[in-house]
Each structure stands twice: as C-alpha cells, then as structure tokens.
Amino acid sequence: MFNWLEKVLNSAEKKGEKIYLLDHIPLYTSQHTYDCAIRLKVLLERYQHIISGYFSGHTHMDELTLVEEYHNDKKYSVINYICPSLTTYSDFWPSYRVYNADLKTKFVKDYTQWRLNLDETNKNDKPLWYISYKASQFYNVSDMNDYDIISKANIDYKYVKKTYADTPDNELMYNDQRVINRVKCEFNSNNYKELLECKNVDKGGEYYLHYVLNMLFKKWPKNE
C-alpha cells in the first residue's frame, strides 16, 4: 500500500500537481500499528509541499491533529482534518463540513461545520441543520494553515462539546477533567503509542493488545 501511495505522490510531484489525501483511520487510533503510522508520517513529511489537505474519519468525532515531521518533532508537516459523520449515533449529532480552499494553492483556508439538531428535527418532523462553528473563528486563526493553532486551541468545555458534535446527551462529561485530558492527548498524538503514553495508561490489556498487533505485522526496515 505504501509503495503504491509513494508512487502516486511522486508522480504528482513530478507533474507539479497538488493533492488531497483521504484515508479512513486517523494516525493516533489503535487500528494503526506503530510502524504503519510512522511510515505514513514519513510520507506526509516528504510530500508536504504538494499535500493541500489531509482528511480522515472513523472516530465520528469532530477533531483535528497536527502531524509532526518525523525528523523534527518541533515542526509540523500537515494538519489532519478528522470529520464527524452523518451517522445518527446515539451520542453524536449528525454532521457535515464545507471546506473553503485557495484556488491557486488548493490549501484549506477554512471550513464551516454543520450539525443536525436531532431533538428539534424529531419534534418538527423535518431536518433542522445549523452552523456549529466556523473553524478560523473557533481556533482563532486567520486561516487553517496557521500551525500556531496548537498553542491557540483552548481545550475546555467548549472544545470538548465540539469534539462530541454538540450532542446534549454528553453534557455531564464535557467538564470532566478526565475527558478533557483525553481530548488533549488525541489533539497532540501522532500514533497510538504516543496516545497511551499521554493518557498515562497502565500497561494493561489495551497496551498489550496493541503490542501484540504490532508484533504480528512485518516491521518497517529502518533504512527504507
């Protein structure tokens, strides 16, 4: 898979093209083995100049993460936009995003996050969509290419509520410090190992399951 992706990225680079990269599972989740996450991270660093947007899903949560460069963890290569879904989960309101991109560079400049208020929709028997927030205003940046976003983001009640797609069913947990800390860790983690370390998870079942999964897959040779 990575050989194919590298060929596609290399071909786009030679042609002077800009690309949008879409995958399903964000880097920090347990479904990515460590070597898989690192190899993708290296490709994101190498081809960051042609990647105008990197988009994921899977979690059904409203998130973003900044992907650090593999060779310099003080610099960032791309922003990973993790979009909530239209699925009517019991603890997430259905959502969709409208991205605004620069016509020349194709880089994402901003996006508008829409929600479906299920309570009002069920009362009135018609969909009631509303704008939850505009990203540049929410993150207090001029555009979404401002990597200072990580220092400007205030992980608090408002941020956690946004992460869980505004649903009132989760209201009690939005001020829970454990939940706030978990969301902070997801915001700052580029692989599942980092997430577990950030969460200070005891080396129990979750840790060893991920360890076993990593052992089952072929390691990525360090000289590649």
Identify the meaning behind each predicted range.
Residues M1-S11, M61-E224:
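Metal-dependent phosphoesterase/phosphodiesterase active-site architecture
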